[in-house]
Amino acid sequence: QSSLYRNRIYLGKQIVNPLPANAEGRLSKIAGLTPYLTPGHSPGHVIYYHEKDKVILAGDLFTSKKGKLQKPMKMFTADMKEAIAGSAIVKNLNAVHIEVCHGDPVKNPGSQIDEYLRENNR
């Protein structure tokens, strides 16, 4: 084991654990955040919605530029079609603000999602 990583615990082959879900398979809230499965970037990618503040933490579902939603980075997205299709969930969440990992925050993302889907499903 490298001295650089001596404080890390070896996880073996199980790197991630599934999120808790109910009997119907709906993902359980975590600290007030509701997770939604949005595969495409990776098979288990999720976004989190904070309903009280109407904020989506979108991770790598999108990138953004100048307040506009953009496709995720192609070189780091396993299935672009699936990622784009999964982004339709934004229409149902009534968010006023979305944070992405790569780009600036986006205000009122629901107002952009139809155009985003139209442009990127060609």
Residue ranges and their predicted role:
Residues 34-46:
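Active-site glycine- and acidic-residue-rich loops that bind
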Residues 29, 48-52:
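Active-site beta-strand termini and strand-to-loop segments that position acidic
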Residues 40-42, 60-61, 102-104:
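Active-site metal-binding loops of divalent metal-dependent hydrolases
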Residues 59, 64-68:
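Short acidic/His/Gly/Ser-rich catalytic and metal-binding motifs that mark active-site loops
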Residues 55-57, 99:
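Residue-level marker for buried hydrophobic side chains located in beta-strands
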Residues 1-36, 78, 82-95:
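Metallo-beta-lactamase
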Residues 69-76:
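Short glycine-enriched, charge-decorated loop/helix-capping segments at active-site entrances
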Residues 49, 84-122:
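Divalent-metal (often Zn2+) His-rich catalytic cores of metallo-beta-lactamase-fold enzymes
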